[in-house]
Regions:
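Alpha-amylase-like alpha-glycosidases and glucanotransferases acting on alpha-linked glucans and related
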Residues: 1-38, 50, 57, 99, ...
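Short, solvent-exposed loop/turn segments at secondary-structure junctions
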Residues: 14-16, 50-52, 73, 114, ...
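Short helix/strand-capping turn motifs
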Residues: 41, 60-61
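Aromatic- and carboxylate-lined catalytic core of secreted/periplasmic carbohydrate-active enzymes
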Residues: 64-107
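Carbohydrate-binding surface patches
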Residues: 107-142
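Solvent-exposed beta-hairpin/edge-strand motifs
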Residues: 141-154
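Intrinsically disordered, low-complexity repeat and linker tracts
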Residues: 188-249
């Protein structure tokens, strides 16, 4: 087994909630597919599994650290696509040793698509991410299995000449495992929930804040650190934004 890495995060108690940070809410799915499959230990900040919003304020962090009544979210796994996705990803990772301990190999990278493999003891798990609004096709190097199955959609694909040809829906991700080697998984809805309100403007925290300062705050919301370990995988605009959001320094 490989060395254990430090944990990865997309938000925490000091920064804006991921659902607020994402300009395209549909990217909630590919961001979290990456969080649960890239090398490292995934960390979810409480409440973000429900897709709650939280904007960084100048004078207070109260909006980042709300008191939640868990009774209000009792049926979130059934009714909230964000929660259903996080629960499914946790189950997949728990049952897939390669995602915990496997080596990493990049398979494909464009400005909107990204694919990589996690290999462990002869088992290859393939992860595909599509940040585009349209369906994407990928032709990827497979492992020794004759067939692969998606843990998120239950779709099956055959291995031909050592490769698999898969299609990935827009603004989504997939985790492909050798068919028969892993438990059966219930398909999940990949679309992020529609927020009741969206933070599209920045209100001044005091009367002295100018419109220019507010605009600067909006620009700052879209700036995130990029992990050195994934610099090669984050060298194009759309995927760079997603990977940078996924891995915290």
């Amino acid at each position: 087994m490989g060395d254990l890495d430090l944990y990865n995060f997309v938000d925490n108690h000091d920064v804006e909630r991921i659902y607020t940070k994402l300009s395209n809410k549909a990217h909630f799915a590919p961001v979290h597919v990456l969080l649960y499959t890239l090398p490292g230990v995934p960390s979810i900040y409480y409440g973000s599994e429900f897709g709650i919003e939280g904007k960084k304020e100048r004078t207070s962090d109260d909006s980042l650290r709300p008191a939640l009544n868990l009774a209000d979210y009792a049926d979130a796994v059934e009714k909230n696509p964000c929660t259903a996705l996080i629960a499914a990803l946790g189950k997949v990772r728990q049952n897939t040793p390669a995602l915990n301990y496997g080596s990493y190999a990049e398979l494909m990278l464009t400005n909107r698509q990204y694919a990589f493999a996690r290999d462990l003891d002869g088992v290859r798990v393939i992860v595909t991410v599509n940040n585009d609004d349209n369906v994407a096709s990928m032709d990827l190097t497979a492992g020794n299995a004759a067939e692969y199955v998606s843990t998120l959609t239950s779709e099956k694909v055959s291995v031909e000449n050592g490769r698999i040809h898969v299609t990935v829906a827009g603004n989504s991700g997939n985790i492909w495992v050798p068919a028969g080697d892993m438990p059966e998984y219930k398909p999940v809805e990949m679309n992020a929930k529609t927020p009741e309100t969206t933070n599209t403007t920045v209100k001044a925290d005091n009367e002295d804040q100018t419109k220019e300062e507010a605009a600067a705050t909006v620009a700052e919301q879209n700036t995130t650190p990029t992990s050195q370990a994934l610099k090669n995988a984050a060298n194009t605009d759309s995927i760079k934004e997603t990977v940078a959001t996924t891995v915290g320094n």
